[in-house]
């Protein structure tokens, strides 16, 4: 039995907020709980990508966020813009940051460096595997600590781009 056997996809309803638009790009706010791209099963087709296609039929997604992650998604309106953005991601000129809440109090700064591999029984989850995993590096900066809840707010900066590395 895998962790996904009882999963029921219930994406948030409502229109996506457009944060920015120009001749080449449209940037939206993806809510937590919505897939960035459609899943394999028909009941997993509702996604930010398909919702954006309703307004921008030629749109191409330039990157993805995990379903549980809320944040900014960028879409290229045309193939030329998609190629240009893809080159920026490959050259690592695009900087990605995430804010997360984690249990406990962390040092002011740090790095999380572990080798990750797909947990095939529980896809899309990743597991740490020191022999077969691919190195994943995330830098963090401690922003705030809530002593009552024992929770830290941290700024995460992934250096590598492994799936589900955060």
Which residue stretches match the model-derived regions?
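RNA pseudouridine synthases
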Residues: 1-165
